[in-house]
């Protein structure tokens, strides 16, 4: 949840949206022409159920009585320190194909709330991630978010994550931020994030295989403010062929630095072309996600 000392140029916006009751974020998945077949995985959770059999819950994660995915422990309405939880979709995603060399495009949208009793002592954050199917909670939690053992880069992790970081650790930039993480909690790219305590955040993350571009957008409907971050990421060189996707979150490692981490809804779609193909510019599929 940090960035290197040489910080690259970022695409960043902080602008009002004209839509009051809904946000519709649309993007194009550029698919290959003359496609014979494709592997498509798609699911949607408008809310969550206590007996949600298609989710794998790790650590302190649970589904609350409100139908929300509660990633870290809350007791009597108060978040607890040193809590880590993760939730992953049960079915692995075929993210690239070794026999063809092709890589999947994907998009995921979700809404979440992070609420701290004391805003100045928020910790530590929440992340969406892709990891090997058997990946379990890693490290001490806290600023590593249950993803990594340390802040150093290690290719053996085989993890890509987008973190929403509410606490400034030693490896972080000097601000709350959204970061793109590749095999390290020390993000390859970040954008300053004006976290709004207790407010619903709507997120869209998309990956364009044709351009190897990972794009993140976060919007607060209450203030009509948005944040955008984009980076070049070669999934095939980082991830195994099959991954699981999901969320992870952690509270601080001392008693005062705590917050809640609740996912309200989640949708995901991936498309991996498996048939013969020709040019790249004719077959364009449109996917649109709307938050109401």
Curated annotation (Swiss-Prot):
Source species, domain of life: Eukaryota
Residues carrying sugar: 82, 154, 186
Extent of the signal sequence: 1-37
Record: residues binding Ca(2+): 165, 167, 169, 172
One Gene Ontology term of the molecular function aspect: D-mannose binding
Pfam families named in the record: Lectin_legB (PF00139)
InterPro entries (UniProt xref): ConA-like_dom_sf, L-lectin, Lectin_LegA_CS, Lectin_legB_Mn/Ca_BS, Legume_lectin_dom, Leguminous_Lectin
Residues engaged in binding Mn(2+): 163, 165, 172, 177
Keywords: Calcium, Glycoprotein, Lectin, Manganese, Mannose-binding, Metal-binding, Signal
Spans through the membrane: none
Family: Belongs to the leguminous lectin family.
Function: Mannose/glucose-specific lectin.
Name of the protein in its database record: Seed lectin
Organism whose genome encodes this protein: Styphnolobium japonicum
């Amino acid at each position: 949840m940090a960035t290197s000392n040489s910080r690259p140029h970022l695409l960043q916006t902080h602008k009002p949206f004209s839509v009051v009751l809904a946000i519709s974020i649309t993007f194009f998945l550029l698919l290959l022409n003359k496609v014979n077949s494709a592997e498509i995985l798609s699911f949607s959770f408008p809310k969550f159920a206590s007996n949600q059999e298609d989710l794998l819950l790790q650590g302190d994660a649970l589904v609350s009585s409100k139908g929300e995915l509660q990633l870290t422990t809350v007791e009597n309405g108060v978040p607890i320190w040193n809590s880590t939880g993760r939730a992953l979709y049960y079915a692995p995603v075929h993210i690239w194909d070794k026999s063809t060399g092709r890589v999947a495009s994907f998009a995921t949208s979700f809404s979440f709330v992070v609420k701290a009793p004391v805003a100045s002592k928020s910790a530590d954050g929440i992340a969406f991630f892709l990891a090997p199917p058997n990946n379990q909670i890693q490290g001490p939690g806290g600023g590593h978010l249950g993803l990594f053992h340390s802040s150093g880069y290690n290719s053996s992790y085989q993890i890509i994550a987008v973190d929403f970081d509410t606490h400034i650790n030693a490896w972080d930039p000097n601000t709350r931020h959204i970061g793109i993480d590749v095999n390290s909690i020390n993000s390859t790219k970040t954008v300053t994030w004006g976290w709004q305590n207790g407010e619903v955040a709507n997120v869209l993350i998309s990956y364009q295989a044709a351009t190897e571009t990972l794009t993140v957008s976060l919007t607060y409907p209450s203030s009509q403010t948005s944040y955008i971050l984009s980076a070049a990421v070669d999934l095939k060189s980082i991830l195994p062929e099959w991954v699981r996707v999901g969320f992870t979150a952690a509270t601080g490692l001392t008693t005062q630095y705590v917050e809640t981490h609740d996912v309200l809804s989640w949708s995901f779609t991936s498309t991996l072309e498996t048939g013969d193909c020709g040019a790249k510019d004719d077959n364009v599929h449109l996917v649109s996600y709307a938050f109401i």
